[in-house]
Design a protein with these regions (language model features):
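Bacterial N-terminal signal peptides that target proteins for export
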Residues: 1-6
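A short small-residue
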Residues: 24-28, 97-98
Length: 179
């Protein structure tokens, strides 16, 4: 039911944009997703397949892979994509021009919330002392994979480290790896 509502919301939003196109033309829009190993990519491919199957809609949607939320906002700002899957916090940062996003993107709009996001920090057992978020301070001097450059994982990870007072740029050896 949730997927059906999301698809209907997406189709309705795109229909409004497609109404200005000449009759008989099938316009193609780009939906930027995330890495092929993450969750955004298969969800984006499924959405584009469902939308594109609606032949009477007058448009189609092509899903492309990317580094994730941060790159997706840049691709939309540069008009290389018309739709994007992003983490909710990135939507707020993009609209306000806050966090890692320098300039407000005031024409940025949300169509639908997809699912709540949960951050996972995986540590070796020898770095876990009490099983709480305080264990992240045990990472000092360690190599830590934060995700891909320009990804949501990278930026939200840095945001959380900052909030916890962890100086990741000096205390950790950051590695940029995908899922």
């Amino acid at each position: 039911l949730l997927l059906r509502l999301i698809v209907l919301s997406l189709i309705s939003s795109i229909l409004l944009a497609a109404c200005s196109e000449q009759a008989g033309e099938r316009r193609t829009y780009v939906l930027t997703t995330g890495t092929t190993g993450g969750t955004f990519y298969p969800v984006g491919v499924a959405l584009s397949t469902l939308v594109s199957a609606q032949e009477d809609a007058g448009f189609s949607l092509t899903a492309i892979s990317s580094a994730g939320s941060m790159e997706n906002i840049k691709l939309m700002r540069d008009n290389q994509a018309q739709f994007a899957l992003i983490l909710g916090i990135f939507g707020a940062w993009a609209f306000d021009g806050s966090g890692p996003i320098r300039n407000p993107y005031e024409d940025f709009r949300s169509i639908s919330a997809m699912w709540p996001n949960v951050e996972h920090f995986v540590l070796r057992s020898d770095l876990v002392t009490d099983g709480t978020i305080a264990d992240l301070s045990n990472l000092a001097g360690e190599r830590y994979s934060i995700g891909m450059r320009n990804s949501g994982a990278e930026q939200t990870g840095f945001y959380i480290f900052d909030a916890l007072g962890i100086d990741y740029s000096n205390e950790l050896s950051i590695a940029y790896m995908g899922y």
